[in-house]
Amino acid sequence: MINAPVFRRVLALLGDLRLAILLLLVIAIASMAGTVIEQGQSLSFYQANYPENPALFGFLSWRVLLALGLDHVYRTPWYLTLLVLFGASLTACTLTRQVPALTTAQRWHYYQEPRQFTKLALSTTIPQGSLTALATALRAKGYRVWQTDTQLYARKGLVGRLGPIVVHASMLLILLGGILGALTGFMAQELIPSGETVHLQHIVEAGPLARIPQDWSVKVNRFWIDYTDAGEIDQFYSDLSIQDAKGQEVKRGTIHVNRPLRYGGVSLYQADWGIAAIRFRLNRSPVLQLPMAPLDTGGKGRLWGTWLPTRPDLSAGVSLIARDLQGTVLLYGPKGEFLTSLRTGMSTEVNGVTLTLVELVGSTGLQIKADPGIPLFYAGFALLMAGVIMSYVSHSQVWGLQENQRLYLGGRTNRAQLAFEQELVAIARELAPPSQTTAVDL
């Protein structure tokens, strides 16, 4: 059984604003580290970019980086623990501060004596003022009014007291979305040649509770690139089919950058491309195919190449180089000398053999992601915007008391003091007899 005093102390500690600010600061720093440091890269990448001597900032080497989990910040136990603690702090703050404030705001009572009005920041006395006229004026300005024969209470903007609770609830939704995504989400990368079908195999990141779908596969019906007049890439496209375990198509769509295909909570993004193979004929042979591999250019562009034997004993051949899918291939001899260029459908003679270029086969690079927390993210941000707007609504209260042919009027608000004062002054002047000058004492 939970000890009540201990529970209250823990609740008070978690609800401390200073703790919430500290947790938020640490989360922000950790998130910045996850943004600056490349996530999910290979060991060799971190060894090359974060050497031990000299270490970055004197301490951040690849060993420290991996030990702290900075290569996958958002899935580390300590980062998720920070999110849970911050969520607990928000919950405690809501229960100990915001909910009691809302409950107090909903409680009200009539003022029964004139001296009670002196405690209000805004109050005045209207000779021969009418309580009924006051109620009518307040209703016209959107107040909800309760009254007896001699007493009145009115309020509006109670939703403003609900705003902070909605903001806290939205932040909890966002945190829950982040935790759910880290635990159950995954990301895969696949490089698939046109016409091929694959299951998800190359998993880059996955949460401990992630379920990788194996009951469907992805088929690339076609991959193509649109080029500008200058020969630069304008956009690349993939015509994809989702197939069930029996090979039946269950969904089809064409994707390009920033326009994914979604199926079963999984999004398939166009992320990269390559040249998978070259198809050709030698003399009158059937169409043959050789795979092409990316070449190391030292950062000077992208090239793909392969070696084509022109003799059965592999004693002679040519190197084929391509830089894009526009259909041009460069041929080089055994000593690296340039021989000729060849376009799709054209032929040339090499080492006594007629080589005909049929086509270059492109491959599409897909980034495949599942994040079950995204709906909670969207709901949380929508709720956050609503809560912020609600928080800007002023909660205004007005009391009235009619006694000895005098109307005592007073009120208070939690924000927009000047606007409330002007509103109360206007009401007081409306109720005052023509011969009287009424002012609100501050």
Swiss-Prot record:
- Top-level lineage group: Bacteria
Q: Which UniProt keywords apply?
A: Cytochrome c-type biogenesis, Membrane, Thylakoid, Transmembrane, Transmembrane helix
InterPro entries reported in the protein's UniProt record? Cyt_c_bgen_Ccs1/CcsB/ResB, ResB-like_domain
Q: Where in the cell is it found?
A: Cellular thylakoid membrane
Q: Biological process (GO) annotations?
A: cytochrome complex assembly
- Positions of transmembrane segments: 17-37, 76-96, 162-182
Question: What is this entry's stated membrane topology?
Answer: Multi-pass membrane protein
Write out the GO cellular component annotations. Answer: plasma membrane-derived thylakoid membrane
Subunit architecture = May interact with CcsA.
Similarity remark: Belongs to the Ccs1/CcsB family.
Function as written in the Swiss-Prot or TrEMBL entry: Required during biogenesis of c-type cytochromes (cytochrome c6 and cytochrome f) at the step of heme attachment.
Could you tell me which PANTHER family the record lists for this protein?
A: CYTOCHROME C BIOGENESIS PROTEIN CCS1, CHLOROPLASTIC (PTHR31566:SF0)
HAMAP family in the cross-refs: CytC_Ccs1 (MF_01392)
Q: What is this protein called?
A: Cytochrome c biogenesis protein CcsB
